[in-house]
């Protein structure tokens, strides 16, 4: 049996990615978890598998397909989930956290599991509308919306694993895709030169344009991105 509510420690978790999801699974494997759990999720949704974002981008899966813990799961385990609530203040003396939606929750134990932020190359024009990152479902939804526009084109800066997954997904959505990569071969940290060339050819066969040894100078456009200019003037 679960311990009475008044004897449970108040556990507050900031972030609702894969790590806190697995932590809760292990916690609830015990017969007596002993915690009253509250989660603040900056995203307006339940827990999902971020590793499966690429199939969502390509159209092979939907958000519903990659949910790991649905609303019923949180309810079943007595977890309070605040969706779309970004924590903006932690009061360590009062042992409370407060969100941008005005919710304040007390805690006995606090877990901060917000994950990482995507790196945006600090190039001139990086803040133009239409310059996107690839980290969460909102980013994927934005890219899919752009791909639906007539004659949509995409430039992916970076020929690592994530960049190539994004390029492949955008191509499957019907976009004209070009990958710009600084090094001589793709995925040079994981593949040797011969394998990198084989991968490049496989992507070219999918009608994805590849430009290696491409050093980006700036992103051009008035209010919205229009093109990417390389240091050699291309």
Task: Outline where the language-model segments fall.
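A Rossmann-like FAD-binding core segment of flavoenzymes
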Residues: 36, 75, 81-98, 105, ...
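Rossmann-like NAD(P)H-binding beta-loop-alpha module
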Residues: 142-191, 225
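Beta1-alpha1 glycine-rich phosphate/pyrophosphate-binding loop at the start
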Residues: 2-80, 167-194
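Active-site/binding-pocket entry motifs
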Residues: 45-46, 117-120, 224
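FAD-binding core/adjacent interface of flavoenzyme oxidoreductases
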Residues: 1-12, 68-157, 213, 228-234
């Amino acid at each position: 049996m679960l311990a009475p509510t008044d004897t449970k420690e108040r556990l507050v978790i900031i972030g609702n990615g894969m790590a806190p999801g697995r932590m809760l699974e292990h916690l609830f494997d015990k017969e007596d978890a002993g915690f009253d759990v509250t989660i603040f999720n900056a995203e307006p949704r339940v827990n999902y598998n971020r590793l499966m974002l690429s199939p969502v981008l390509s159209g092979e899966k939907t958000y519903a397909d990659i949910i790991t813990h649905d609303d019923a799961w949180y309810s079943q385990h007595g977890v309070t989930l605040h969706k779309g609530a970004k924590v903006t203040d932690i009061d360590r003396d009062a042992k409370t956290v407060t969100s941008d939606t005005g919710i304040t929750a007390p805690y006995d134990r606090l877990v901060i599991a917000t994950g990482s932020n995507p790196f945006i190359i600090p190039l001139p024009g990086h803040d133009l509308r239409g310059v996107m990152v690839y980290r969460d479902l909102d980013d994927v939804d934005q890219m899919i919306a752009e791909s639906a526009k007539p004659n949509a084109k995409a430039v992916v800066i970076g020929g690592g694993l994530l960049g190539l997954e994004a390029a492949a997904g955008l191509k499957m959505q019907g976009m004209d895709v070009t990958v710009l990569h600084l090094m001589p071969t793709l995925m040079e940290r994981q593949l040797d030169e011969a394998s990198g060339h084989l991968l490049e050819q496989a992507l070219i066969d999918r009608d994805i344009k590849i430009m290696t040894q491409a050093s980006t100078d700036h992103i051009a456009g008035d209010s919205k991105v229009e093109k990417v200019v390389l240091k050699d003037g291309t």
